[in-house]
């Protein structure tokens, strides 16, 4: 059966793979987009975004504050690269690295917005570069986000039935699940799923199997917040024939 440990490991490996690949692409873009604002006009949005990241900018360019000073695309790409690295550290630490969390992107949409600001400006004076690797990178981020690929989870139905029965048995305000008819089970489950909050469960009495299933569901919720809402695809309960 699926465990929360293997699920976390798979998601973190996916995130690490795609975020490291973004770093490779950003370094290539930094070598390509070498336009100088002493020669061409750069859109004000690029400078505005650099200013928004002033605190991180100081950390990125602490060794040479004037590096890429007349090459705003390269300067902003350096900041984006630092944010991607921080995002990966934040995810790999499962949210415990507070320094990384401060500099990390909250979601892939924030990264897309930064890249689109650059592309919009580049397209005003150099469409070849605007439609090249930069556009490819944007498309990749739109497709893969921080999760690379949606992870489906599959559990067998009898496993779920045992877990639900155990939860009912551990909750003083719920009936004996095994004694309920099929219709009664459906009614109880529908009623519980329709309202917020959870039954009063005495967790000390739960079996290891139930604890593992609850840990899995908690991991799914945590990872969706950490990596992105598209981290998981379908949750499949196989061989389902009753409640």
Which residue ranges define each predicted feature?
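Extended active-site and interfacial segments that coordinate phosphate-rich ligands
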Residues: 2-29
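Extended, charge-enriched "interface" segments that sit outside catalytic cores
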Residues: 31-226, 233
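Active-site beta-loop-alpha junctions enriched in small/polar residues
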Residues: 153, 237-242
């Amino acid at each position: 059966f699926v465990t929360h440990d293997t699920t976390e490991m798979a998601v973190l490996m996916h995130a690490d793979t795609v975020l490291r690949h973004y770093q490779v692409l950003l370094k290539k873009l930094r070598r390509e987009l070498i336009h100088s604002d002493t020669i061409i006009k750069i859109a004000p949005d690029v400078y505005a975004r650099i200013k928004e990241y002033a605190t991180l900018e100081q950390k990125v360019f602490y060794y040479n504050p004037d590096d890429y000073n007349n090459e705003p695309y390269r300067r902003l790409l350096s900041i984006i690269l630092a944010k991607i690295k921080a995002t990966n550290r934040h995810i790999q630490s499962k949210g415990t690295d507070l320094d990384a969390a401060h500099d990390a992107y909250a979601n892939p949409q924030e990264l897309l917005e930064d890249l689109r600001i650059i592309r919009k400006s580049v397209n005003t004076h150099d469409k070849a570069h605007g439609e090249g690797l930069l556009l490819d990178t944007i498309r990749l981020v739109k497709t893969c986000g921080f999760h690379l690929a949606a992870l489906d989870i599959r559990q067998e139905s009898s496993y779920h039935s045992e877990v639900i029965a155990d939860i009912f048995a551990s909750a003083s305000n719920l009936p004996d699940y095994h004694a309920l008819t099929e219709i009664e089970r459906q009614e109880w489950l529908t009623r519980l799923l329709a309202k917020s909050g959870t039954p009063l469960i005495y967790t000390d009495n739960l079996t290891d199997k139930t604890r593992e299933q609850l840990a899995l569901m908690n991991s799914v919720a945590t990872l969706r917040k950490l990596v992105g809402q598209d981290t998981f695809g379908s949750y499949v309960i196989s061989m389902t024939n009753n409640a």
